């Protein structure tokens, strides 16, 4: 069942179709598992270490490559007023935000952790999705919840370490 509308962009132009399909399948599975509303949208971009470093520098003031960055559209910024969209009669789909994954960093980490690139891409996609849904790992209690849910989803899908 297709729950998510995923706008996928491969900036690397060399990610195998089966890797893209795997990540889409995992995200669809996770969306169903987490009971995300059907028709919900997100964008997924695969980029290089250089590409993600540029984004990390520009938006997070960290001048280094990272594995995954998520930009949640429903996250409140400082000084923003919360809007209750339920007050409006809108037929627009829910847009969660953007997940950006460095395929180079995924490959490096897969080697470091001793598992497949597919497992690492799946992990990063679910990690990014959970951030879009408001989960975080800045505090130990938050980390326990988020990482526990990540493992639960990946294990249920069959993509274990």
UniProtKB/Swiss-Prot annotation:
Keywords: Cytoplasm, Endonuclease, Hydrolase, Metal-binding, Nuclease, Ribosome biogenesis, rRNA processing, Zinc. Disulfide bonds: none annotated. It is found in: Cytoplasm. Zn(2+) binds at residues 127, 131, 137. Binds 1 zinc ion. GO terms for biological process: rRNA processing. Its cofactor is Zn(2+). The keyword ATP-binding does not apply. It holds the Pfam family YbeY. Its EC number is 3.1.-.-. One of its GO terms (molecular function) is RNA endonuclease activity. GO terms for cellular component: cytoplasm. PANTHER family: ENDORIBONUCLEASE YBEY, CHLOROPLASTIC (PTHR46986:SF1). Belongs to the endoribonuclease YbeY family. Single strand-specific metallo-endoribonuclease involved in late-stage 70S ribosome quality control and in maturation of the 3' terminus of the 16S rRNA. This is Endoribonuclease YbeY. It comes from Listeria innocua serovar 6a (strain ATCC BAA-680 / CLIP 11262). The gene is ybeY.
């Amino acid at each position: 069942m297709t729950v998510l509308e995923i706008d996928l962009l491969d900036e690397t132009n060399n990610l195998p179709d089966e890797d893209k399909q795997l990540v889409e399948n995992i995200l669809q599975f996770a969306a169903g598992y987490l009971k995300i509303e059907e028709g919900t949208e997100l964008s997924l971009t695969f980029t290089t270490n250089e590409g993600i470093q540029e984004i990390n520098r520009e938006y997070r003031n960290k001048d280094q490559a990272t594995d995954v960055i998520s930009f949640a559209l429903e996250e409140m910024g400082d000084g923003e007023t919360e809007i209750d969209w339920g007050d409006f009669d809108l037929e627009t789909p829910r847009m969660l935000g953007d997940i950006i994954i460095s395929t180079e960093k995924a490959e490096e980490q897969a080697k470091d952790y001793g598992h497949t690139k597919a497992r690492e891409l799946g992990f990063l996609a679910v990690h990014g999705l959970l951030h879009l849904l408001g989960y975080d790992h800045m505090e130990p209690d938050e980390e326990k919840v988020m990482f526990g849910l990540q493992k639960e989803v990946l294990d249920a899908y069959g993509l274990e370490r």
